[in-house]
Amino acid sequence: MLLAIDSGNTNIVFAVYDGDTLRGEWRASTDSERTADELGVWLTQLLTIEGLNRLDISAAIIASVVPAMVFGLKTLCRRYFKCEPLVVGDEGVDLGLSILLDRPEEVGADRLVNAVAAHKYYKGPLIVIDFGTATTFDVVDADGNYCGGAISPGINLSLEALHMAAAKLPRVAIGRPRQVIGRATVPAMQSGIFWGYVGLIEGLVKRIKEEFGSDMLVLATGGLAPLFAEATKVINALDADLTLRGLLEIHRRNSTPVRG
């Protein structure tokens, strides 16, 4: 079985695949102070609850946008699963796509993994919107090349910034307001963020298509993707497991060392 690890700025997602079958998926908060042993004991217990044996995991792959997490996650794989993990972005790891950027080394691993999965399962040209700590818009052409994109602050990050920077604005949860014109502070904040982001999505998608010069499939992933897909017609498809499926595909493209 394969252990796929998606380490983001806010959460780490651990998933176990048996072939194409997703056997389990768990989340932990991203914390570079947490040791490999803490994560290992926690994950081993969750595997046991699902009826899985950690020793049946023979390979692992890691994508991380937090460099400080990589060492601990590699140690976790070696110590608890007796395997040397592939790390997206390491030299020699074949993604199966060309990165058509001036500085390809700067692209986040999660964005590249999403591009791999999007091209594999949906073809192109397409736009991938990932609603995470940042909201990213990534362009993949019909040949599977990664062409770049746009990065904006994530929804929850924007809400937190409002609360932290303005003394009288409270911390609020994201939600779809019943109306655009808020009649109190909280609904006004929710309206500004929610409908503002709908406008952001629609505006960027329109401009990307115009610049790219063709119609494109728009695919959304991330926890808030369903909420925004209901509010705009520009999103054509949702895929909650896009990043994990991208990790699975990259693992298949690369020879994985035999467990020691």
Swiss-Prot record:
EC category name: transferase
Binding positions (K(+)): 130
EC number(s) given by UniProt: 2.7.1.33
Cellular compartment(s): Cytoplasm
Alphabetic keyword roster: ATP-binding, Coenzyme A biosynthesis, Cytoplasm, Kinase, Metal-binding, Nucleotide-binding, Potassium, Transferase
Cofactors: NH4(+); K(+)
Pfam families from the UniProt entry: Pan_kinase
GO cellular component terms, semicolon-separated: cytoplasm
Pathway the protein contributes to: Cofactor biosynthesis; coenzyme A biosynthesis; CoA from (R)-pantothenate: step 1/5
GO molecular function: ATP binding; metal ion binding; pantothenate kinase activity
Catalytic activity: (R)-pantothenate + ATP = (R)-4'-phosphopantothenate + ADP + H(+)
Active-site positions on this chain: 110 (proton acceptor)
Gene Ontology terms: biological process: coenzyme A biosynthetic process
Residues involved in substrate binding: 108-111, 185
Residues bound to ATP: 6-13, 133
Cofactor note: A monovalent cation. Ammonium or potassium.
Subunit-structure text: Homodimer.
Stated family: Belongs to the type III pantothenate kinase family.
UniProt function note: Catalyzes the phosphorylation of pantothenate (Pan), the first step in CoA biosynthesis.
Protein name (database record): Type III pantothenate kinase
Organism: Paramagnetospirillum magneticum (strain ATCC 700264 / AMB-1) (Magnetospirillum magneticum)
